[in-house]
Amino acid sequence: MRSSHQICASITDICNVKNGHRDRQLLLGNGFDVIESSENWAFGYSLKDGYKGYVKEIDLEPFESKTHWIKSLGTHAYIEPNIKSTDQIFLPFGSQINVISKAKKFVKTKHGFIPEQHTLPIGSYLSDAVQVATKFLGAPYLWGGNSINGIDCSGLIQAACLACGMKCPGDSDLQELFFPEVKGPWCKGQLIFWKGHVALTISDTELIHANATAMSVTIEEIKATLSSIDAAGDGPVTHRSQI
């Protein structure tokens, strides 16, 4: 029987099988509907994008409504409304929380006190997906990653889109199918797809992407990236979209 849960860990993996490799990640407060459970693993799907897989049962708790989400790259929940007090848990960008009350410049949650300036109400969004993506500049590359601790190409695109109120699948192949194709000259806010990879243009000459060459999120010239990917045998471009 299906049951609604949410993530109670800072970050958890969605795996292809029990004890399998990481396909994607979910963040604190993200909803996850459980279809079945066995051997300490729950099979189900993410509420933000429908992504299916296995999550450790220990990282799940019953679903509850949330009031705010984390808009900073990351933040901490403190035991008191004081930056010098003990921090209890790290909340990555995109985590969701339920604010109980406000105290000084903090919001009180069951996780502890979080700096209010790092939060936005649920239903309020950022306005520039490119600007969001550049927040992650220098973040380490991690296959299937969805946070500042480690992120991959499609995770970066999804984080930028969801933060701006746009729906976005989790993997690059699904993103390619989801976003309509465009043609014409390069401009800011275009998604460039290759087989198994995606990047986002930040201008008519540069793009940002999480890549395994640099093992981080980098900004590069569009022409240079097109040439290097083609030279590596992973070209050509298969699709372009505007977000």
Describe the function of each predicted region.
Residues 94-95, 114-115, 127, 134:
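Glycine- and small hydrophobic-enriched segments that form the cores of compact globular domains
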Residues 140-147:
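Second-shell loop/turn segments in exported
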Residues 45-62, 107-121, 200-215:
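Short, compositionally biased
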Residues 133, 147-164, 169:
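Active-site nucleophilic cysteine motif
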Residues 214-243:
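Hydrophilic extracytoplasmic domains
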Residues 30, 95, 189-190:
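Structural motif
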Residues 1-19, 25-28, 35-38, 45-48, ...:
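SH3-family beta-barrel domains
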Residues 166-223:
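...with weaker cross-activation on analogous glycine-rich loops/strands in unrelated enzymes
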